Amino acid sequence: MVDLEAAVEAVHRAESAVAQHDWFRAWGPVLTALFIAERGFLAGEDAAWISEIRNQLTVLRLRALECYAATELGIAGTELAGAVRAGQQLIQLAPLRESGYRYLMNALAAQDNLAEALAIYSQLCDTLREQLGVSPSPATRELYQQLLAAT
């Protein structure tokens, strides 16, 4: 439980730093949170309290991946590949959570892979339409329009 508490504290510090665009201050705490959240918890065991801890770790991992993607985008340069990986992981873990798609689209566009970024938007549209019958949020549509304008 100590690790979970440390990870919660670390992701909170990382989120605060990201909100202030202090990418280098976010770096250490976000890595701590990711390392803890990705470890898993009592593999092979099954109890209600274990499931609750696993759910908390999953939510924590999503928050940490979002912070990591934002931090990598903020640092830019050679760190953009990390933002791409984080966006891909977010999409895999939570395919209906649009933030992962936006991080991935931004990272790909920053790497001059604009067509690939636009294809990610199309993938999101298909997923949302098939699963929920809805369109992307205004924030995601706005990012798509910005990327289109850059072509």
Go through each PLM region and give its residues.
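Intrinsically disordered, charged and Pro/Gly-enriched terminal/linker segments
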Residues: M1-T151
